[in-house]
Structure formats: C-alpha cells, structure tokens
Regions:
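Channel- or pocket-lining gating/hinge segments that regulate access to a cavity or pore
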Residues: 224-343
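Soluble non-transmembrane domains of integral membrane proteins
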Residues: 35-228
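N-terminal signal peptide c-region/cleavage motif recognized by signal peptidases
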Residues: 29-31
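N-terminal secretory signal peptides that target proteins for export/translocation
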Residues: 1-14
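Low-complexity, intrinsically disordered segments with a bias for serine/threonine
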Residues: 8, 16-18, 33
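Intrinsically disordered, low-complexity peripheral segments of secretory-pathway and membrane proteins
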Residues: 34-76, 83, 292-357
Length: 357
C-alpha cells in the first residue's frame, strides 16, 4: 500500500514539473514571437522621377522638379500608425519646405490590396548642397535629395528605394531616377550628369529634444537620392584655357626681344600681370566665398610667378646689355634667353599636371 502511494506521489511530481516546463516554454515562445513582431519595422518604399535639376553654384543650392511615390502596407489597428503619420517624411536638406509637404502634394492615391497604399505626387523646390571647388573648373559635384521620417525611429519605420520600379522601367543603372528630358539635354547646360545613386542609411540623434518619453539616443532611417555632375570641358577651354594662354604668350614674347628693348618688355609683362589679375577676379566672381585654394587659383599663382621672373630677367639682361663691351656678358645673355625659352613653358605645363594630382 505504501509502495503504491509512493509511486503515485512521484508520478504527480513528474506531471507537475512537466506542466511547469511546458508553460515556461509556451510563455517564452510567445515572448519571442511578440518581440519579433515588435522589432519588425514598417517598410516605406520610395521612388522619384526627376524632370529637371539645376545647380546654383554661387548660392550652394540646386532646384529640382520631380514626381515622387510611396508604397507601404499598414494596418493601423495593429501598428498604431496612421497614413498621415507615415507620410510625415521630411526633406532633410530642403529649403523653405512646409510641414506635411508630402500630404499636401498628393495627386493620386490608390489601394492595390487591403491595407496596401500607393501614393504619388509632384514636388518642386530648392535644396542645399555642399560643393567642393578644389578642382574648379574641372570639379565634380554631388547633389543629394535626402528623405527622413522624424515621426518614427528606425525600429518602427525604415525608408527603402523602390528598386523594382526602376528595373521594370528598364532604366540605365547609372541614370536611375532621371527623365528622358534630362538625358536628352545632358551636355547642353554647362554641366553634365555622369551618374546617379540611391543609398539607404540611418542617422543617430544623441538628444531627446526635451521629451522625457524619448530615449537619449534615437536612430532614424534615411533614403538619399544622389546626382553626380561634372562640367563640360569645351566651354571651359574657350572661357578659361585660351585667354590664359594668350596672356602667358604675351609674356613669353619677352624672351625673343633684344635686351635693350626694356620699355617693350616692361609693357608686355605689366599688361599681362594686370590682365591676369582681372581675369582671376572675373572667374572667382562666379563662385561663392570659399576658404581654400582652388585649382584655377594655383594656375594663376604660377602665372604670376612666371610673369615676375620674366620682369626680373628683362631687367637683368638689360643691365648686362649696358656692359656690351664685355663679350662674356653677351654670351651669358644668350644662354639665359635660351634657358628661359625652354623652362618657361616647361614650368607651366608641369604645374598644370602637378596641381591636378
């Protein structure tokens, strides 16, 4: 009898432990499942179709006109997100952009499936960008259109590119988002678009912005459309290279004048110097205030150096000519002129190549 009770007790304890284990496993599974659902952010697909883009280099801005669209799936009863909140996407580098810009610009909305949204609109406006003129006029620039939803962090919402649309449209991978109008007049506007890019990222804000309900460090998803441009070479050859070559050619003529023609040599060098200064001021007038030396400035500096050396050599050769009774001075003048004729273009060409590296 005692043995039967012992077996019954052991069986009851085993069932009890089994029940506790099963309950713990079930609870853990539910927690993991809930956590997985909670950690899965809403995916907001985005695309643009650029109709026009025009940079203003002096103001460090550009103007863009484009169609935009968003595609997303959302059951607000489960996510707690409304369509209006999801569309609170901002242009991070936009100028004078109103709040709820995308909601106000909607021109078409449809629902291809339950809780699925397709929304499109049109935007035209100005954007900031940071040009780099170090290699001007042979510089390359990057103009970005940056989207960010400041309402939900990256754990709740991420913005991704609608790459499927670009593939279906059979767009050139190097020119995604560009309209045929832009591509058709690509080389006729003083600059040339040589590629585009789309990148997804997140930005960390190390502030709660005074809201105690927020974490001190929050990450928000971003989508960046980039347009890369350079300048058409031929217009700048006629605008920059040819005038500077003419100025330096006038200075180079000094080395073919007789040593006693100091007045002609002085006139050529001084005129060339003043022309170079005025020319540099004219070119820099097309650029904003910048705090670094650009490529074209370096070419002008080497031009000033060559002009100054030419002026100094003219005076030296004139003084040697005054001592014409000394045959050694005539030979020295001849050698100096010969070396100057060789090194003058050599120094300038070397500087052009060296500064470009």
């Amino acid at each position: 009898m005692a043995s039967s009770k012992l077996k019954y007790t052991r069986l009851s304890v085993s069932k009890l432990f089994y029940g506790f284990g099963l309950a713990a496993i079930t609870l853990f599974s539910l927690q993991v499942s809930a956590q997985a659902k909670k950690s899965k952010p809403l995916v907001l697909k985005s695309g643009i179709y650029l109709k026009n883009i025009t940079p203003d280099f002096k103001a460090s801005t550009f103007r863009a006109e484009f169609y935009w669209w968003f595609i997303f799936e959302n059951d607000s009863s489960k996510t707690g997100m409304s369509k209006e909140d999801i569309l609170k996407v901002e242009f991070v580098n936009g100028i004078g952009v109103e709040a709820n810009v995308f909601t106000n610009e909607i021109i078409y909305e449809t629902h291809p499936a339950p809780n699925t949204y397709y929304i499109t609109g049109f935007h035209q406006g100005d954007f900031y960008f940071t040009p780099d003129f170090r290699m001007y006029p042979f510089d390359k620039q990057q103009m970005d259109i940056i989207l960010e939803n400041g309402q939900f962090d990256s754990d709740q919402l991420v913005i991704v590119a609608d790459t499927a649309s670009f593939k279906r449209s059979k767009q050139d991978p190097n020119f995604k988002t560009l309209s045929n109008d832009i591509l058709r007049k690509n080389n006729s506007r003083g600059f040339r678009i040589y590629k585009t890019d789309i990148s997804e990222s997140s930005i960390l804000y190390n502030s709660d912005f005074g809201d105690i309900s927020l974490e001190g460090n929050s990450s928000y998803g971003r989508l960046q459309y980039s347009v890369f441009i350079d300048r058409s070479i031929l217009p700048y050859i006629s605008k920059f290279v040819i005038p500077l070559m003419i100025i330096l050619l006038l200075v180079y003529f000094v080395y073919f004048l007789p040593s006693d023609k100091i007045d002609t040599a002085a006139a050529l060098t001084v005129t060339s110097l003043l022309s170079a200064i005025a020319f540099q001021s004219s070119i820099n007038g097309d650029l904003p205030e910048i705090g670094y030396v650009i490529y074209v400035d370096k070419l002008f500096y080497i031009s000033y150096f060559l002009i100054a050396v030419s002026m100094a050599l003219s005076l030296w050769l004139f003084n040697l000519d005054l001592q014409s009774d000394n045959p050694a001075n005539k030979e020295k003048s001849r050698k100096i002129l010969l070396l100057a004729r060789i090194f003058f273009p050599l120094i300038f060409i070397s500087a052009v190549i060296l500064f470009a590296l």
